[in-house]
Amino acid sequence: MAAKPGIPKGTRDFSPVEMAKRNYIFNTIRDVYHLYGFQQIETPSMEMLSTLMGKYGEEGDKLLFKIQNSGDYFSGITDEELLSRNAAKLASKFCEKGLRYDLTVPFARYVVMHRDEITFPFKRYQIQPVWRADRPQKGRYREFYQCDADVVGSDSLLNEVELMQIVDTVFTRFGIRVCIKINNRKILTGIAEIIGEADKIVDITVAIDKLDKIGLDNVNKELAEKGISEEAIAKLQPIILLSGTNTEKLATLKTVLSDSETGLKGVEESEFILNTLQTMGLKNEIELDLTLARGLNYYTGAIFEVKALDVQIGSITGGGRYDNLTGVFGMAGVSGVGISFGADRIFDVLNQLELYPKEAVNGTQLLFINFGEKEAAFSMGILSKARAAGIRAEIFPDAAKMKKQMSYANVKNIPFVAIVGENEMNEGKAMLKNMESGEQQLVTAEELIGALTK
Amino acid sequence: MAAKPGIPKGTRDFSPVEMAKRNYIFNTIRDVYHLYGFQQIETPSMEMLSTLMGKYGEEGDKLLFKIQNSGDYFSGITDEELLSRNAAKLASKFCEKGLRYDLTVPFARYVVMHRDEITFPFKRYQIQPVWRADRPQKGRYREFYQCDADVVGSDSLLNEVELMQIVDTVFTRFGIRVCIKINNRKILTGIAEIIGEADKIVDITVAIDKLDKIGLDNVNKELAEKGISEEAIAKLQPIILLSGTNTEKLATLKTVLSDSETGLKGVEESEFILNTLQTMGLKNEIELDLTLARGLNYYTGAIFEVKALDVQIGSITGGGRYDNLTGVFGMAGVSGVGISFGADRIFDVLNQLELYPKEAVNGTQLLFINFGEKEAAFSMGILSKARAAGIRAEIFPDAAKMKKQMSYANVKNIPFVAIVGENEMNEGKAMLKNMESGEQQLVTAEELIGALTK
């Protein structure tokens, strides 16, 4: 008795319709990356554990999928070690490879390994799956795709500008209305400097973020509870209440941060990015948002995140500037800036708003009904001509009942069906049926091609 | 001191140029699959080991990459079992998941799991990597892509015909001249039947294959050495010496196999496939080749393989008809037929024959030289218009030395460079340089777009 097959938890099969939608997402992102001169690379699914371990924190190390060594993976391990049953320690003996956890560390490894072949600035994109042994839950998977673009080897803020243009263009093409949030790590550092509470910056941004919900008094109360001094809270007031246009916000920040060189640098960078983008004219809103504080340890300059306006969902794209991507692999001084589109969340948003263009999801355009060997042979001739003209077409391979064949066309959403019986054959034509309108007309091969390619 | 990073043996990084070439291959195959009504699916990289084990023979089981269970993978294992150090047995306790070894078993699992959602016949294609812990060697990798198309749930030989048309179309598009070899498992069974040596069929095809090299006498000698009776060898003579057109070969086989019902069925099937293809008109040669005997245990009807004519390399595509794909997962009676393109070998052939179309490998079409902030700001305006017109364009992000920027354009094979200095800015124009001819002309944004989109 064969076992009923299943798949590992947190993983997914993608059906033809889901794949068509996913391809639409990936192709749209890819096309825009190309418009901006980014080039694709791919790295192996497995990396050496020595490359991956220690790059994602202790928690990250635990979430790596490790691959058991081939052959006798027990060699070199003492009985005592075995009986210790120390799962983490022995994993590093049983396994020397792991599945990649993100695209950033493999990219850093790639840059270091291929430094002599790469011409900098290197504008690369990468669309590949990553794996995390996370507890699966709604919207969180153990295998999912990342779509990253990074420019490394250039400090220019034009890179930040272009990445925001890419974000704007991609979501405009999707038809998803978004707000692009932008902040700068240097501004956050500046704030910490002027209030003298460098280690409290996350607490501060979390509290500020609640202003709309809980009001100023409660925000200040929360800050005090987090151990921030009265004096510091007083200094924070203009920042908590920061409002108005981006220009107004930047003006306020210049005053508040006048004593912090780093802070002012962050304001200046943001000003350049926002001003240049204003000149270029974005289709979507871009907003300076001081509560944005993603990946503090990693980013060193501009940081950004994208929120969908019409769907309740977390950030659907994010990124920022980092200053030392490759240092951990012994190559210092490589600055970079990148973005990552969240394909799975974009998939959900497009589904919820029903924004997939019809042609993105449609496959076969024409099905020939099969009435038997002779009719099929005749149909195959027209079919070949249709395909040569670029029409995606098929013939039902078996002379099954008409009902079954028509139902196949319906399920596959095929818009046209060609019916070739004895009468049609005698006339050297096919009956072309429009499945939506129900309209039928007797056509030659050329007329059929004309009808489907117009 | 950071360790010099490497990647697991048998795996590869793909550079931008390699990726462009690989995408050209995948896109060509994908486009043709679509023309024939095939739909894409994807399955997870990891499958349950219970799904994979026992499907590829004992050797295959050893070549599976196994993924260590998360958490305490020692639980439920006795000290005695641990100390036995039985690597294979304990792997099944330490690991419950493995990386997929091919696309066929996951596809079978998919069909069984989703049988209620699938409308048959199901024409699916799948382009994904597979992993094998094989000893790496030239042209053999531990991670490589397969590009499979299968039709399941239809016995019709039209499926075989269409798969051969797909093969013909794909290689015509690549510009690779090929010979499509076709055989039929039923013909081989028939031969074994009439000579009464069912278990010797592989020995027979191997010996026949050497006819050109070693001559008839030596072939017969080899057959005798393999323990085939004198009487059987006599009966085999017309088959060993089989020659002429496909029609002539089929005529001979009809006579020789007249006592084998299965053999005659195989001849009849081959006749239908070859005759229909002749009517359709293939661009490449198709040849009935009795020495073709791939995967005997698996295939049950037509089998095929593709050989490149202008490069010395093994089969670059193969496939065939199987009758019980899903039986091992408890779903009987599903017949199917499929092909698999060998992307890595096709990559090598296209490289060797230098057949990549120029536009497939080219990325960015236009680079703006960056002379400083003001010039860059002006250039960004034209750049936006060019991109909106679909031109893949970039600006060098830093105001680096001219030589460095021009060298970037050269390395990236960018055909046009736009130079915007003070003079150009004052005229509201850009100097457009054709990198191949060296020709320069002063153009407006509109003229620039015109020059690059014509």
Swiss-Prot record, chains A, B:
Quaternary structure and partners: Homodimer.
Reaction catalysed by this enzyme: tRNA(His) + L-histidine + ATP = L-histidyl-tRNA(His) + AMP + diphosphate + H(+)
PANTHER family assigned: HISTIDINE--TRNA LIGASE (PTHR11476:SF7), HISTIDYL-TRNA SYNTHETASE (PTHR11476)
Localization terms from the record: Cytoplasm
UniProt main location, coarse: cytoplasm
Swiss-Prot/TrEMBL keywords: Aminoacyl-tRNA synthetase, ATP-binding, Cytoplasm, Ligase, Nucleotide-binding, Protein biosynthesis
Parts of the chain that traverse the membrane: none
Entry EC number(s): 6.1.1.21
Keyword field contains ATP-binding: yes
Protein family (similarity comment): Belongs to the class-II aminoacyl-tRNA synthetase family.
GO annotation, biological process: histidyl-tRNA aminoacylation
UniProt GO molecular function: ATP binding; histidine-tRNA ligase activity
Protein name per Swiss-Prot or TrEMBL: Histidine--tRNA ligase
GO cellular component: cytoplasm
InterPro entries to which the protein is assigned, alphabetical: aa-tRNA-synth_II, aa-tRNA-synth_II/BPL/LPL, Anticodon-bd, Anticodon-bd_dom_sf, His-tRNA-ligase, HisRS-like_core, HisRS/HisZ, HisRS_anticodon
Entry-linked SUPFAM superfamilies: Class II aaRS ABD-related, Class II aaRS and biotin synthetases
NCBIfam families referenced in this protein's UniProt entry, alphabetically: hisS
